[in-house]
């Protein structure tokens, strides 16, 4: 019995090692959909998320090498934006010190574009297939983010991706179609479990297509 158990564990480990390796980099939105992506791609790929929250693109530049590590990634699906376009004020009582009236913008769109250009240049060195995910929707009433800034920052990101020939997964378009009930609350950028599953479907599809290329 013990021998059989050990054999089954060993075979399972070898099988997992033979699967393509996928890295998802992003903020809490991607943390929300990664488990469903991993479940959808079970048996087809090993899906991992960078440790913790990737926050803004400046943080991404600082921590990217650590997140990539020495792993030979087959696909890297990555996103920044919601933290970059957020306004914060140290005296704000709202979670995350968000305050789009009196706060300071985390990353200008010009700096964001420059940061992404540097990030993509580094990611290309991995030889992984790269997929950029457009930033999801900023809803009306968000305390630290302005409606429409998601479009502006996504346009900047798209310029970078076109320059480098990187595939774009338009999660902004996906989330724009969501009913109010798929957001955790009015004025909140986060999604319910059902909303995250819908995003996961788009992410899984993009990764599957990349693996088949």
PLM region spans:
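Catalytic nucleophile-elbow at a beta strand-turn-alpha helix junction centered on a G-D-S/GDSL motif
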Residues: 20-34, 83-85
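Residues that form or flank phosphate/diphosphate-binding pockets in enzymes
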Residues: 32, 58-59
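Short beta->alpha junction loops
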Residues: 49-56
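Sec/Tat signal peptide C-region and signal peptidase I cleavage site
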Residues: 12-16
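A short, Lys/Arg-enriched amphipathic alpha-helix followed by its capping loop at the start of a domain
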Residues: 36-45
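Alpha-helical cap/lid subdomain in secreted, periplasmic
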Residues: 18, 43-44, 59-213
């Amino acid at each position: 019995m013990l021998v059989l158990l050990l054999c089954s564990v060993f075979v399972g480990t070898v099988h997992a090692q033979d699967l393509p390796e996928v890295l998802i980099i992003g903020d809490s939105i991607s943390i929300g959909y990664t488990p469903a992506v991993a479940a959808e791609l079970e048996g087809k790929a090993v899906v991992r998320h960078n440790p913790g929250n990737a926050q803004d693109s400046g943080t991404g530049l600082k921590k990217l090498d650590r997140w990539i590590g020495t792993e030979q990634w087959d696909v890297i699906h990555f996103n920044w934006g919601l933290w970059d376009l957020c306004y914060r004020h140290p005296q704000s009582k709202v979670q995350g010190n968000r305050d789009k009236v009196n706060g300071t913008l985390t990353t200008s769109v010009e700096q964001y574009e420059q940061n992404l250009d540097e990030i993509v240049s580094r990611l290309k060195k991995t030889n992984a297939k790269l997929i950029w995910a457009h930033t999801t929707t900023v809803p009306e009433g968000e305390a630290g983010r302005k409606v429409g800034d998601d479009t502006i920052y996504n346009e900047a990101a798209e310029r970078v991706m076109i320059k480098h020939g990187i595939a774009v997964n338009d999660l902004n378009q996906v989330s724009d179609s969501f009913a109010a009930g798929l957001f955790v609350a009015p004025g909140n950028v986060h999604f319910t479990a059902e909303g995250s599953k819908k995003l996961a479907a788009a992410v899984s599809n993009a990764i599957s297509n990349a693996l088949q290329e």
